[in-house]
């Protein structure tokens, strides 16, 4: 693995050597015995003079006003309530930070250092220099921001954007606003102040040459990364870690006494002890050595460490979990509705262990009665307890092939909370009346006790109702009519879904089978059938009723919102569709049904998978919010997550909110106020994204591990991405994606058309575009780098007899050249 050189900040401090060539005054040194200026300690704040102003020597002329601006009258020097503290601290004190902030808040706009100096009576060269350094320190500490004209303003008085930093391996990044809206572009020099995942305040500085809003970092609110995975390296006596995550652009320097016994080249877990800034790299210490090589057995462990997933439960949490009863005793039931004789069943995957939901359906004069019974986690996990605090911290269970990082200890998630068959369990019920058009006409929520009559799988249900398999039907016995009625209800709900225009994306999830060493032995696509969709529609119905009930009772709760596509993304989508002679309505008029119509139109095309993927990527991200904004994808006016409290904290919050409304207690007696619920909704959204990233990383590594076994093999696929450096190809059967580098195309000079997404040879005229079918040869796969390289073997329309370039030396693909941003 190629390693980066230590970043500049990783070198020994220049302060260790004498500064022989420094000019008088520039280094701010003093002669022996001469007392330091009273403001000299401000230099320890580590800030250079503010941008746009050079340090002046002691004999420099007094600063003047900024060009084109009238200098405000000094008047009376403002009262400084902290003057005594400053006088005690410095021999020649200047205005305190508090006084500077108070003055700026009274000004009509940003003030330059010269204007502030005039107002504060600090116009002498040394006093002006001291003020300049203090202002620089306040900018560094996030108390002030400085605009391009050199004016300073308090952060809270400016229109700043709060968001999360999303880094790009090329060095630049984006700020994803927490309030939604378009991202801010962050150039490389701004990205040196932050790391991927940091929550920051930023200000919009202008529009870049591509028409994107550009921003600068004003203050880091919360560090998003406290540890990372990487290769430990030693170069010229300096220890550092090269991050495995290429979005972390700077190597982490490791002090000699913090190496944890790691050797050069080993894979390690590094805990960050000091954040980076524009001049210094991050500092860290080694907390675990994973080994010399990333093996399949380490893939999940690496993801857990790299994404900082809470893995082990604190002892106090385990102690509380151990005190929870293992069975439901008669005395615990109280006045709960008794559903134990109702033939509720669970329907899940073969490998499921935690059973959140059970369903029952019966026909009646008005249509159908649907009972959705959900594990009553809120009965066991109470607000403010160690169990609740840990569940809140995790916010979601994380699912890897063959392994789960649960939100709750297994004694609850796989035990007393899980709706296992033939045992009594506490549940929280949404009982619905559904008419023959698939609309819920009435619903009610109540606490109950149930006894699942069977643990069914999607495969069993599909065989019984979809394939009419006699053996499966006989095995189900008395439950078969109930399952058939559920399938009848599904057809009704499915028609209602189609009528309202909900988007129907066909999922293509890859499932891996591992042996006891963690090696991938099998990979295949998860096939969704009506059994999956049956449960999905039942859960959606209950989720909608939960959202409606909460809205009617005005109880703070996290809604699951999915807004229409961002306008800029949608504009790009329209341009893309033009190349395929397809279209959608303008952004202001687009509805979910428009997507559905287009998906039906392209379903039989050979490039349908690619087009569907592009349509999916154009969508907004679904998040949790204390305010209901509806769900665009499902074409619903209100939506909340109610059905999975064992594995999702928002569902637990929704249960608590509904129960509070049912109790009839005043709103001000609810555990959470609106502000607290907003903070929890944001945290749950962030934790969900973290889990998704961890699951995606493991998926990518296992895909690469699977393709390592097929190096030299040939496969058919479709071009899923076109760039200036090559083609991305998605294989038909496994959905694995790899790169055909331009060096693995027929020899030519290739021109990339960013608008049409094509790569065209100037001499031969060969053209490659999105959706083209190709045959590739697997050239190389690296589980550690999460990269798969292909070589083009056949392209539809390509002239026969075209010579392909020879393989690069030792079978390695040519080095990818970084594109300028």
For the regions a protein language model found, what residue spans apply to each?
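A structural feature that tracks compact, well-ordered secondary-structure segments
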Residues: 185, 728-730, 779-781
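A short macromolecule-binding patch
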Residues: 182-187, 248-254, 735-753, 802
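Charge-lined substrate channels and their catalytic hotspots, especially those that engage the 3′ end
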Residues: 2-371, 378-423, 455, 460-463, ...
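Acidic/polar residues at beta-strand termini and the immediately following turn/coil
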Residues: 147, 177, 243, 435, ...
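A generic structural signal for residues embedded in beta-strands
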Residues: 202, 270, 722, 776-778
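Electropositive polyanion-binding surfaces
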Residues: 269, 275, 300-302, 306-309, ...
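Intrinsically disordered, low-complexity linker and terminal regions at domain boundaries
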Residues: 198, 206, 215, 741-784, ...
